[in-house]
A protein has these predicted regions:
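A short glycine/serine-rich beta->alpha loop
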Residues: 25-30, 63-67
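DPxDG-like acidic metal-binding loop motif
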Residues: 57-89, 94
Length: 179
């Protein structure tokens, strides 16, 4: 059984297929063309790992924050695949998925930022303790003068493998984070 990971909250399309230690993920900057690129890329990934859509048993979807339309694309596509395959759906915060690969155990906190409108940023602050993510500042809209002085990651793409690695901490179901 494969797990499909998908995030379209940012200008990037993050898509992956994972099973245990094996799997592949791709991050492609598509700006506002997520819907055009998503299913052809999924077909490519399925071919690369030698799997069929029927073998997808779980989906981990990025819940945002981010582009309203982008969030809806991942949710609609992901829920459609889940319904067709009878797969379970889980949600993970997109900011956490973007910084997870850079968080070191008991290391300094990181604040991933996605550029929002009106000179604002979507941001949150995280650290890793005991192998688990720890949220120090909940997701919200921030002005430049509100940003912490260190540990900033500006517009990192959500990571497909991080979405998979965060599955043990994910909540079943998905709830978009519109800020």
């Amino acid at each position: 059984v494969w797990t499909l990971t998908l995030d379209t909250a940012t200008p990037y399309l993050a898509l992956g297929l994972f099973r245990g230690e094996e799997g592949v993920g791709r991050v492609v900057r598509v700006e506002r063309r997520h819907e055009e690129a998503l299913f052809p890329l999924l077909d490519d990934l399925l071919a690369e790992v030698g799997a069929r859509k029927e073998e997808i048993g779980a989906l981990v979807l990025g819940e945002g924050p981010g582009s309203y339309t982008g969030l809806r694309i991942a949710l609609a596509a992901g829920l459609g695949v889940a319904l067709a395959q009878g797969a379970r759906v889980y949600g993970v915060n997109s900011l956490l998925a973007a910084c997870w690969p850079y968080l070191e155990e008991s290391g300094p906190p990181l604040t991933p930022l996605f550029t929002a409108r009106n000179r604002l940023y979507y941001g949150a602050t995280y650290t890793r303790q005991g192998g688990r993510p720890l949220e120090l500042l909940p997701p919200g809209k921030l002005r430049a003068e509100e940003l912490p002085p260190t540990g900033l990651l500006l517009d990192p793409p959500p990571d497909p493998r991080a979405l998979y690695e965060l599955l043990p901490f994910a909540r079943e179901g998905v709830e978009p984070l519109y800020l």
